[in-house]
Curated annotation (Swiss-Prot):
Homodimer; adopts a domain-swap conformation at the scissor helices connecting the transmembrane domain and C-terminal domain. Heterodimer with K-Cl cotransporters SLC12A6 and SLC12A7. Interacts with AP2A1. This is Solute carrier family 12 member 5. NCBIfam families: 2a30. PANTHER family: SOLUTE CARRIER FAMILY 12 MEMBER 5, SOLUTE CARRIER FAMILY 12, CATION COTRANSPORTERS. Keywords: Cell membrane, Cell projection, Chloride, Disulfide bond, Glycoprotein, Ion transport, Membrane, Metal-binding, Phosphoprotein, Potassium, Potassium transport, Symport, Transmembrane, Transmembrane helix, Transport. The gene is Slc12a5. Residues 21-45, 98-111, 945-962, 1019-1041 have a biased composition (Basic and acidic residues).
Length: 1138
């Protein structure tokens, strides 16, 4: 026999019209206020959050209370995903020290000026700045000389090696730069955040010194062009003879260099905006000069320029002192001597005493620029290294030599070599011409999409400049005479710039263009170096440099600029471009070496945060680039390399040992213990940065009577998460006393260790003996780990048989575990249906890992699938992310924002936004809630007397009715129709359950009398009706699940409370509604998924609802094979920053 109740409810529109809208409004805290520990390390608080930099703190603070009621108690700490994603639209990433950012920081009291979003693309933001920084003074002043000395073959190898070094470095830099957002600091930021403050500080200071000496080199190049090619008469110091020209030139360089440095520093101090305004002008000069060179090469093939050079025998003559390349000239019928005669003879008379070599050899005039079609390339293939003071000679020309040991008069108008040259020296001089590849990363804050622009723009710029350099080497050797190439200052071609003689339409194009380009490069160096020093100083890793972190009110680094100018003056006092170039080569090579090292280390360690969007990198390429940089350092100058490494080492040790303690043990074991102690003490200094966060797992397993693990799949899953490279502690609890159960604990440890070894889980095992299970688990959670090496995540299985346990202690222990992990700010992973999880030998050839991101609680849901997909079991599973849109959410914009967020996180996944519109609470939800509350009352009655049970039932009834009136005054009215056959058999069926059948067309019972509050007949005709049916089948099924300790008398007292829907706690109804609706959506989308991850709601704050909480979770995960409930620890575990 069944007992039927008919319940009629008003339409939803009627109830919604009179409902108080505030009753369903709940505030969501700003996602930036997520509770988390203070983060130390880099002084940038933005990096602790995933990406949020929104100024709209109110948007998205409301949520649909009925659809998401299951998560309502956590909305103050875990915001809805829609409100989190809305921050993407207002995300800005400003470089440190930028003018607008500093003004905004300094004017907090007033109205802040809105900052424009980054607008620069790949071409303007990365490609052109890199071209400007790479092309420089060496191309115009020294490349022709390098080709003449080393020959085409060796010069080609030199350029290829240097360009390969920068290309490999650019690949490594692209991987680092795309591993998150680089707010400011360029290479210093990337290295320091990848290798730590010690390496970052050491290499950052080396890079600063390199940039500063680069400024000195550019200034010296500017003075050389000014005094040698533009205005030679401006020289203050003049040589009395040829031997004193070098010393006079050095003094002129020092004086004019100091003046130019002062002017440039003043311009930078007054306002960097003027430097930026003229940057494109300087870049235009560089590009125009290079185009003029190529135009000249093309023209020389059919119309070579007229630049004759004069040879005495095979010796090259300087054209400064004479005009006619001949010993004698004919004026009418008379033979007269030329000015050249007077330079080699005692007088202009024909019978004068002349130099012996001048007397024995003839004077020959040849073209200095024969052109590309002359076949000159064969003669310039091989090297012609010179020693200092040697005359530049042309191979293949007849020459009558002198006796060995005959001194050469330095006052004769020969072209002399000013320095001893060799291959390694040329490498050191040439290498600065390929530096400047960091220009794109230094401007990352101004780019529209830095993760796309930096790799593309930098690599394209290096490819372009490499092509220009390599082609220039070949074209210079094919078009220009060898003795002209080896003439560093163009003395043989009337003092013209050698590369200018090849240019079209005029050499002045190259001279003026190179002058302005070197001026611009010097200004850029004096602008960038102080900001780099300011970034290092503000990090606070080098205490004595902190004073240089301050500046003017607008953020300009005044003190850093002053120090930069002083160091730059040191380079100018050296006064030789060829001496300064190897110095800055050392510092740049060291910086590039550590960029490659950082990429190689990150790749080999495979830390969870290492997810570069740039995919075309490999640790072997980074290692090759690092080796090449180290080799070039010693090739250029082994003593400069040692000095640079010593400086970096001293800075490293200073930063490392500033307040640190060092201790050495005895032997290998003592060293290991000392290193472990040292590392643990350093970990104790503070919580890890978000970028260094990794899951440190505490895996709670249960052992049977034979001390074997009940669910070994938990350890299989732990092994599959090993990509996190974190700590693993496998813990278990034995009930009893330590004295009696110590042997069993040892056997359990051995059993767990064997299983860990079989599952390839590297970690520790800990078995605790406690008087009860709850205290033992609590002890493991509190005391697991050592010092800073502690767990931050707890992995546990779902209590599968929590309903059937006689003492019902399992689910109570589970809820206490959830509460303790929350209190300890630990993440919690709960595996449901753990027996269905795959073992390590299994492989999924297809399928998906579905993430249901309901609320944001630190990003754990994003990180876990990424780690799992590194394991071969899950490698072929794709990742899908679902999030839920509410009534007021723009689902299209949410999908776009979520896609952008994943792009910044460097995570590849399919994105889908599921719309959950407001809907009526279904009859099935009421049924589930009613059954749940009945079970709850049964559980509570186990320890109550009859009078206590009656009072408890009455208090719950009153509380439920009061809740209905307070929270939902327009709740749909309920009408109860009881048939005549009311003979019930409650005592005989103590565990009867209620089944609801939703029927839109069934008529109400005519024999029932209307209730006092019944609506008129007209309204009742359209009301939906719901039938409650008490069925025996469910009663039998429920009874067969397990024995119940409840007495029949207690059940009779319990059923004295009528199971009316109006008695239901409306909070439970709404929570059940959330669980049912979410479950329907999840099952619909993810029924065939290999694994489903979703947010785990927190336990109720009122402990009276603990048993209901278990039912909510059970309903939420019904009909799903493999489920992992994830609950964050209250801090960010994933970030978009590098």
């Amino acid at each position: 026999m069944s007992r039927r109740f008919t319940v009629t409810s008003l339409p939803p529109a009627a109830s919604a019209a009179s409902a108080d809208p505030e009753s369903r409004r709940h505030s969501v805290a700003d996602p930036r206020r997520l509770p988390r520990e203070d983060v130390k390390g880099d002084g940038n608080p933005k990096e602790s959050s995933p990406f949020i930099n929104s100024t709209d703190t109110e948007k998205g603070r409301e949520y649909d209370g009925r659809n998401m009621a299951l998560f309502e108690e956590e909305m103050d700490t875990s915001p809805m995903v829609s409100s989190l994603l809305s921050g993407l639209a207002n995300y800005t990433n400003l470089p440190q020290g930028s003018r607008e950012h500093e003004e905004a920081e300094n004017n907090e009291g007033g109205k802040k000026k809105p900052v424009q979003a980054p607008r620069m693309g790949t071409f303007m933001g990365v490609y052109l700045p890199c071209l400007q920084n790479i092309f420089g003074v060496i191309l115009f002043l020294r490349l022709t000389w390098v080709v003449g000395i080393a020959g085409i073959m060796e010069s080609f190898c030199m350029v290829f090696i240097c360009c390969s070094c920068t290309m490999l470095t650019a690949i490594s830099m692209s991987a680092i730069a795309t591993n998150g957002v680089v707010p400011a600091g360029g290479s210093y930021y990337m290295i320091s955040r990848s290798l730590g403050p010690e390496f970052g500080g050491a290499v950052g200071l080396c890079f600063y010194l390199g940039t500063t000496f680069a400024g000195a080199m550019y200034i010296l190049g500017t003075i050389e062009i000014l005094l040698a090619y533009l205005f030679p008469a401006m020289a203050i110091f003049k040589a009395e003879d040829a031997s004193g020209e070098a010393a006079a030139m050095l003094n002129n360089m020092r004086v004019y260099g100091t003046c130019v440095l002062t002017c440039m520093a003043t311009v930078v101090f007054v306002g960097v905006k003027y430097v930026n305004k003229f940057a494109l002008v300087f870049l235009g000069c560089v590009i125009l000069s290079i185009l003029a060179i190529y135009a000249g090469v093309i023209k020389s093939a059919f119309d070579p320029p007229n630049f004759p050079i004069c040879l005495l025998g095979n010796r090259t003559l300087s054209r400064h002192g004479f005009d006619v390349c001949a010993k004698l000239a004919w004026e009418g019928n008379e033979t007269v001597t030329t000015r050249l005669w007077g330079l080699f003879c005692s007088s202009r008379l024909l019978n004068a005493t002349c130099d012996e070599y001048f007397t024995r050899n003839n004077v020959t005039e040849i073209q200095g620029i024969p052109g590309a079609a002359s076949g000159l390339i064969k003669e310039n293939l091989w090297s012609s290294y010179l020693t200092k003071g040697v005359i530049v000679e042309r191979r293949g020309m007849p020459s009558v030599g002198l006796a060995d040991g005959t001194p050469v008069d330095m006052d004769h108008p020969y072209v002399f070599s000013d320095m001893t040259s060799y291959f390694t020296l040329l490498v050191g001089i040439y290498f600065p011409s390929v530096t400047g590849i960091m220009a794109g990363s230094n401007r990352s804050g101004d780019l529209r999409d830095a993760q796309k622009s930096i790799p593309t723009g930098t690599i394209l710029a290096i490819a372009t400049t490499s092509a220009v350099y390599i082609s220039s080497v070949v074209l210079f050797g094919a078009c220009i005479e060898g003795v002209v190439l080896r003439d560093k200052f163009g003395e043989a071609v009337n003092g013209n710039l050698v590369v200018g003689t090849l240019a079209w339409p005029s050499p002045w194009v190259i001279v003026i263009g190179s002058f302005f380009s070197t001026c611009g490069a010097g200004l850029q160096s004096l602008t960038g170096a102080p900001r780099l020093l300011q970034a290092i100083s503000r990090d606070g890793i080098v205490p004595f440099l902190q004073v240089f972190g301050h500046g003017k009110a607008n953020g300009e680094p005044t003190w850093a600029l002053l120090l930069t100018a002083c160091i730059c003056e040191i380079g100018i006092l050296i006064a030789s471009l060829d001496e300064v170039a190897p110095i800055l080569s050392m510092f740049f090579l060291m910086c590039y070496m550590f960029v490659n090292l950082a990429c190689a280390v990150q790749t080999l360690l495979r830390t969870p945060n290492w997810r570069p969007r740039f995919r075309y990198y490999h640790w072997t390429l980074s290692f090759l680039g690092m080796s090449l940089c180290l080799a070039l350092m010693f090739i250029c100058s082994w003593y400069y390399a040692l000095v640079a490494m010593l400086i970096a080492g001293l800075i490293y040790k200073y930063i490392e040992y500033r307040g640190a303690e060092k201790e050495w043990g005895d032997g290998i074991r003592g060293l290991s213990l000392s290193a472990a102690r040292y590392a643990l003490l350093r970990l104790e200094e503070g919580p890890p940065h978000t970028k260094n966060w990794r899951p440190q797992l505490l895996v709670l397993v249960r052992v049977d009577q034979d001390q074997n693990v009940v669910h070994p799949q938990l350890l299989s899953l732990t092994s599959q998460l090993k990509a996190g490279k974190g700590l693993t502690i496998v813990g278990s609890v034995l009930e009893g006393t330590f004295l009696d159960n110590h042997p069993q604990a040892q056997r359990a440890e051995e059993s767990i260790r064997r299983l860990m070894e079989a599952e390839k889980v590297k970690g520790f095992c800990q078995v605790v003996i406690s008087s009860n299970l709850r205290d033992g688990v609590s002890h493991l959670i509190q005391s697991g780990g050592l010092g800073g090496l502690q767990h931050n995540t707890v992995l546990v299985g779902w209590p599968r048989n929590w309903r059937q346990k006689e003492d019902h202690q399992t689910w109570r222990n589970f809820i206490e575990l959830v509460r303790e992990t929350t209190a300890g700010h630990l993440a919690l992973l709960v595996t449901k249906n753990v027996s269905m999880f795959p073992g390590n030998p299994e492989r999924f050839s297809e399928g998906s890992i579905d993430v249901w991101w309901i609320v944001h609680d630190g990003g754990m849901l994003m990180l876990l699938p990424f780690l799992l997909r590194h394991h071969k079991v899950w490698r072929k599973c794709k990742m899908r992310i679902f999030t839920v849109a509410q009534m007021d959410d723009n689902s299209i914009q949410m999908k776009k924002d979520l896609t952008t967020f994943l792009y910044h996180l460097r995570i590849t996944a399919e994105v889908e936004v599921v719309e959950m519109h407001e809907s009526d609470i279904s009859a099935y939800t009421y049924e589930k809630t009613l059954v749940m509350e009945q079970r709850s009352q049964i559980l509570k009655q186990m320890h109550l007397t009859k009078n206590e049970r009656e009072r408890e039932i009455q208090s719950i009834t009153d509380e439920s009715r009061g809740s209905i009136r307070r929270k939902n005054p327009a709740n749909p009215r309920l009408r109860l129709n009881v048939p005549e056959e009311t003979a019930c058999d409650n005592e005989e069926k103590p565990e009867e359950e209620v089944q609801l059948i939703h029927d839109q067309s069934a008529p109400s019972c005519p024999s029932s009398s209307p209730s006092p509050g019944e609506e008129p007949e007209g309204e009742r005709e359209t009301d939906p009706e719901v039938h409650l049916t008490w069925t025996k089948d469910k009663s039998v099924a429920e009874k067969n699940k397990g024995p119940s300790p409840v007495s029949s008398e207690g059940i009779k007292d319990f059923f004295s409370m009528k199971p009316e829907w109006e008695n239901l706690n409306q909070s439970n109804v709404r929570r059940m509604h959330t669980a049912v609706r979410l479950n329907e959506v999840i099952v619909n989308k993810s029924r065939d998924a290999k694994l489903v991850l979703l947010n785990m709601p927190g336990p109720p704050r009122n402990r009276n609802g603990d048993e209901n909480y278990m039912e909510f979770l059970e309903v939420l995960t019904e009909q799903l094979d493999r489920v992992m409930l994830v609950r964050g620890g209250g801090r960010e575990v994933i970030t978009i920053y590098s």
